[in-house]
Regions:
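Conserved N-terminal alpha-helix of the aminotransferase class I/II PLP-enzyme fold
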Residues: 13-61, 83-88, 94
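Conserved PLP-anchoring active-site segment centered on the Schiff-base-forming lysine
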Residues: 71-89
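Conserved C-terminal alpha-helix-loop-beta "cap" of PLP-dependent enzymes
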Residues: 74-76, 268-343
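Hydrophobic beta-strand scaffold residues
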Residues: 79, 102-103, 170-172, 281, ...
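PLP-dependent aminotransferase-class I/II
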Residues: 99-137, 141-144, 150-158
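Active-site C-terminal subdomain of aminotransferase-like
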Residues: 108-109, 135-136, 142, 150, ...
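Catalytic PLP-binding core of fold-type I/II PLP enzymes
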Residues: 151-183
């Protein structure tokens, strides 16, 4: 069985594992105050071209989203998100568990626009019952989106300008950030992303680490006391050095970018396999996620040998599914998928 369900199905990149093993018996202080975390922070600041940034390491995406959002919002406030956004669809009410509403906007290709944010905020502020309605007080997006699509530089700039106009912090979920910035046609680099938001994170769990996300706080107003809420939300690991070591390895010799590009290149082959066989796609994704629409009977047959993620029902006999490439995807796996898809069409 070969699994393309997601990009976190293996352990960690061998370079990360080697560094963890090399440092295993070195004693350090706890809770991310060690020299490995310090080195990783400096490397991330350099990559972001943001020496003023605060960098914090957390374990996983849901924990990171919950901690960041809870640190920004007051009790009566909510976060604007695409209706397809991860915090709305795939986090089991984690944001709501902090007492904050996820306010959804209809997405197009997984994205929301500056105009949508402006329209909603204006409606809220001008409604006669405004004080009875959850106050939209920050904006959440992911890059790439849930379907693997990307914001253009113009789209993100407009969104950030609107957020600043209304005083709404913009938070970018970067769980798959590497796969986004290394994609064909990507208009945004990590330094540009850092300049066009208030806080974002660089995903490790899905991009070569065993676990871990690196939160980068750009807005000075959001920096104060963040480590307190990290602790309260279970985000400060006693063995925090394990996070620093991994990110230090990932940002040595451009490893993070090299393995992200590898995943995208594997994904382009996967896309071509399905397109050349006549299958349409749910999304025009330039990243590591590809989503063909297939007849259910063919999906069942393919599922005997390959894992994929069910996405949505398209009609009575067709479904959209997701095939993910990752830093660990091999050419042999892709070739096996190609042969199986071609066999379906014979």
């Amino acid at each position: 069985m070969i699994y393309f369900n997601s990009d976190y199905l293996e352990g960690a990149h061998p370079s990360v594992m080697a560094r963890l093993n090399e440092t295993n018996m070195v004693q350090t202080v706890g809770y991310g105050e060690d020299e490995y975390c310090a080195a990783a922070r400096e490397k991330i600041r350099a990559v972001c071209q943001a020496p003023e940034a605060d960098v914090h390491f957390l374990v996983g995406g849901t924990q990171t989203n919950t901690t960041v959002i809870a640190s920004i919002l007051r009790p009566w406030q909510g976060v604007l998100s695409a209706d397809s956004g991860h915090i709305n669809c795939h986090e089991a009410g984690a944001i709501e568990s902090t007492g904050h509403k996820v306010i959804t906007l209809p997405a197009a290709e997984g994205k929301i626009t500056a105009q949508q944010v402006q329209d909603y905020v204006e409606w809220h502020r001008n409604d006669e019952s405004t004080e009875h309605i959850v106050q939209p007080s920050m904006v959440y997006i992911s890059h790439p989106t849930e379907g693997g699509t990307l914001y253009s530089k113009a789209e993100l700039t407009a969104l950030y300008d609107t957020c600043r106009k209304y005083g709404l912090p913009l938070f970018i979920d970067g769980a798959r950030l590497g796969y986004g910035v290394m994609a064909d046609g990507s208009e945004l680099t990590i330094p540009e992303i850092a300049r066009l938001c208030d806080v974002f994170y660089i995903g490790g769990t899905k991009v070569g680490a065993l676990f871990g996300e690196a939160v980068v706080i750009m807005n000075p107003a959001l920096k104060k006391d963040f480590r307190f809420i990290m602790k309260q939300r279970g985000g400060r690991m006693a063995k925090g050095r394990l996070l620093g070591i991994q990110f230090d390895a990932l940002f040595t010799d451009d490893l993070y970018f090299k393995i992200s590009r590898h995943a995208d290149e594997m994904a382009y082959q996967i896309r071509d396999i399905f397109v050349s066989a006549g299958y349409p796609l749910l999304f025009d994704s330039p990243t590591n996620q590809q989503s063909p629409i297939m007849p259910d009977d063919e999906l069942a047959e393919l599922g005997k040998s390959f894992g994929y993620e069910y996405w949505e029902r398209v009609d009575k006999t067709h479904s959209g599914v997701r095939f993910c490439a990752s830093w660990a995807t091999t050419q042999e796996h892709v070739d096996a998928l190609r042969a199986a898809v071609q066999a379906l069409r014979k």
